[in-house]
């Protein structure tokens, strides 16, 4: 499909720079094909879902994945390098998007320096070698540390990777360390938050449980590729970067049981949906999953695992707007987004949310 079909006008002022307080006070637009748009708040979810439905949360935890360092030149001078880690390849290896990526070569040594507070990790620095180069500034870094030692150094030296549309307008600060993390985050490894989950509070989770609405957890480590613009003119020419995830046998069994008993699978965020669809059999059965997925969902895709999707409002021409258009219908979503813009809904990672019901036959 032509990428320009997914374009729309979005005033920059509608891109949220901070979340609302409390988290569940965010606006929620209910979008059900064949029904009028309905406005609510995230805190109203217990009344918008049914007993027996099962919410699926992505419990990945955002790591401080932006590293700044220096590459030594042959003449003794140095060049500043910024690396955004996006996918772990092994105990000592990460794929990263680097700037200036085109000027780096295999074998180059990079020394990542002091931490955010000006202090150093125990060794004073973190060294890495450029092990491979990819496209669009992507490199593979082989670090001199591995495993938990590498994790500790990255946690000490790295910076929180706010999305570009926010980071371009203000720097990350101490408040983001809490705001850009779900209350149920558990498994470290993401470089972007599963942002639909940012709206949930312990109180809301308790009220959902009291209403007979179940919950399940999976893990998909969101990569920096989620921020990349679609440069192709046709969706068939766009390549998704792989992300790693896991659905345990217990989670798969819980979800299959919920559906067998008449409940709906409610994905909290596009990351949960993408992993569920990657793990689903043609008959809708969800199997355990451990590995990488690069699933790219556009209109025409037949959904197998997910009945309802809660997700934030996405940017024009993004793979995420393509996904929601596949789920609820392109014209339905264009109308919903036009309404959201006209009514001043807040967009993107810190913005408001929508509750989408899958269109018949999709």
From Swiss-Prot:
GO-annotated cellular components: cytoplasm
Keywords: Cytoplasm, Queuosine biosynthesis, S-adenosyl-L-methionine, Transferase
UniProt cross-references to Pfam families, sorted A to Z: Queuosine_synth
Cell membrane recorded as keyword: no
Documented EC number(s): 2.4.99.17
Compartment(s) of residence: Cytoplasm
Record's keyword annotation contains Transferase: yes
Molecular function via GO: S-adenosylmethionine:tRNA ribosyltransferase-isomerase activity
InterPro entries for this protein: QueA, QueA_dom1, QueA_dom2, QueA_sf
EC main group: transferase
Catalyzed chemical reaction(s): 7-aminomethyl-7-carbaguanosine(34) in tRNA + S-adenosyl-L-methionine = epoxyqueuosine(34) in tRNA + adenine + L-methionine + 2 H(+)
Gene Ontology BP term (one): queuosine biosynthetic process
Record pathway: tRNA modification; tRNA-queuosine biosynthesis
Domain of life: Bacteria
Quaternary structure and interacting proteins, as annotated: Monomer.
Physiological role: Transfers and isomerizes the ribose moiety from AdoMet to the 7-aminomethyl group of 7-deazaguanine (preQ1-tRNA) to give epoxyqueuosine (oQ-tRNA).
Family of the protein in this entry: Belongs to the QueA family.
Protein name: S-adenosylmethionine:tRNA ribosyltransferase-isomerase
Gene coding for it: queA
């Amino acid at each position: 499909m032509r990428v320009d079909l997914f374009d729309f006008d979005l005033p920059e002022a509608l891109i949220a720079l901070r979340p609302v307080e409390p988290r569940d006070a965010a606006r929620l637009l209910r979008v059900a094909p064949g029904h009028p748009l309905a406005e609510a708040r995230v805190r109203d979810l217990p009344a918008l879902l049914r007993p027996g439905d099962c919410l699926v949360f992505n419990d990945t935890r955002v790591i401080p994945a932006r590293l700044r360092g220096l590459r030594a030149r042959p003449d003794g001078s140095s060049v500043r390098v910024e690396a955004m880690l996006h996918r772990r390849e092994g105990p000592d290896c990460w794929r990263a998007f680097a700037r200036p990526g085109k000027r780096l070569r295999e074998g180059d040594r990079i020394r990542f320096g002091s931490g955010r507070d000006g202090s150093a990790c125990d060794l004073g620095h973190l060294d890495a070698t450029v092990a491979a180069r990819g496209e669009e500034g992507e490199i593979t870094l082989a670090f001199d540390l591995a495993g938990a030692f590498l994790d500790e150094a990255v946690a000490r030296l790295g910076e929180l990777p706010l999305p570009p549309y926010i980071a371009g307008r203000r720097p990350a600060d101490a408040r983001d360390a809490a705001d850009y993390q779900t209350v149920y985050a558990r498994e470290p490894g993401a470089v972007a938050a599963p942002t639909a989950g940012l709206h949930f509070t312990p109180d809301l989770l308790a009220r959902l449980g009291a209403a007979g609405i179940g919950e399940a957890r999976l893990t998909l480590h969101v990569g920096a590729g989620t921020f990349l613009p679609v440069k192709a003119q046709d969706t068939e020419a766009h390549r998704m970067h792989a992300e790693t995830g896991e659905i345990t046998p217990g989670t798969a069994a819980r979800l299959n049981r919920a559906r067998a008993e008449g409940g709906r699978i409610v994905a909290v965020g596009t990351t949960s949906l993408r992993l569920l669809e990657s793990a689903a059999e043609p008959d809708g059965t969800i199997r355990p999953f451990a590995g990488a997925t690069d699933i790219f969902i556009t209109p025409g895709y037949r959904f197998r695992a997910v009945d309802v999707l809660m997700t934030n409002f996405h940017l024009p021409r993004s793979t995420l707007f393509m996904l929601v258009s596949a789920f609820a219908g392109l014209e339905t979503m264009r109308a919903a987004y036009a309404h959201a813009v006209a009514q001043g809904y807040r967009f993107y990672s810190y913005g408001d949310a929508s509750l989408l019901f899958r269109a018949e036959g999709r």
